[in-house]
Amino acid sequence: MRSSIHASRLRKMGQSIPASTGPMARSANRFLQNRAAIFGLVLLTPLLFAVLTYPLWLPYKPNDIDLMAMNSAPSWKHWFGTDGVGRDVFARTMEGGRISLLVAVSSVVLSTAIGFLIGAISALGGRWADAIAMRSVDLAMTLPPVIFLLVLASIIGSGIWSTVVVIALLSWPVLSRMIRARLLELREREFVMASRGMGAGLGHLLFRHGLPNSIDILVVYATLQVANAILLEAGLSFLGLGVPPPAASWGNMLNAARSTAVLEQFPWQWLFPGGALVLAVLAINFIGDGLRDAFDPRAELN
């Protein structure tokens, strides 16, 4: 009798205590409760779908020239109109999105890898490694960004992968400082000190302890940096130092439409690529802010 009463009490206690969830699950719940982040997803999802799948359902290619339809206004045939040589603006806007996102994502992957490695080596590699890494970060951060971009782009040259390298080399120092700050705290933990005592090498410390404990920083940085990279690519292409024509990118489409005649008489040639650029950057920033708030440790206290 007593055992049955005791068992029923245990069942009631188990029902009254909520099941604990891990930190990643709690972060995901906080992200899904962020209205701005969900709004960003709603904006970005159809844009990504259109950009990635447009060759399957659009009858026009981005570089198809139709001299009989030069500077045509938006219509059922050409949804976004045509440019000065009769190319479909919708097709070029979609292709420009593909190239701009390719440049942005590739540069973010490269800058994230560089930033993590330098920051982690600085924190876990010893005194000399820390001094050398931090002096390189200080040097990179003291260079004027615009001048550095222009000089580097003029040296490397224009092109998709040249633009990727230029943007990546400008973007990694901030991440290195964040990773270093996180791992300086981590290296004093008992499990890291135990690994050192057992003879673990730098590679083991970086990828067994450093990387898993830096995932939140890397995810938030990468998301927000994609938006910054899209803007940097657009700026370089607008100045003629990014993706070269006839390849389409949002930046060189705006560059091609910068004349007063086009701005005033054919506004669809800059309005649609400019609108897509703003929409993508806005949506990605909303998502990045939502991820930052979701991973914020202070949210655990609330």
From Swiss-Prot:
It is a multi-pass membrane protein. InterPro entries: BP-dependent_transpt_permease, MetI-like, MetI-like_sf, OppC_N. The keyword Lipid metabolism does not apply. One of its GO terms (cellular component) is plasma membrane. Residues 97-288 form the ABC transmembrane type-1 domain. The keyword Transcription regulation does not apply. The chain crosses the membrane at residues 38-58, 101-121, 147-167, 200-222, 230-250, 268-288. Residues 1-22 are annotated as: Disordered. Coiled coil: none annotated. Probably part of an ABC transporter complex that could be involved in peptide import. Probably responsible for the translocation of the substrate across the membrane. Belongs to the binding-protein-dependent transport system permease family. This is Putative peptide permease protein BRA0407/BS1330_II0404. It comes from Brucella suis biovar 1 (strain 1330).
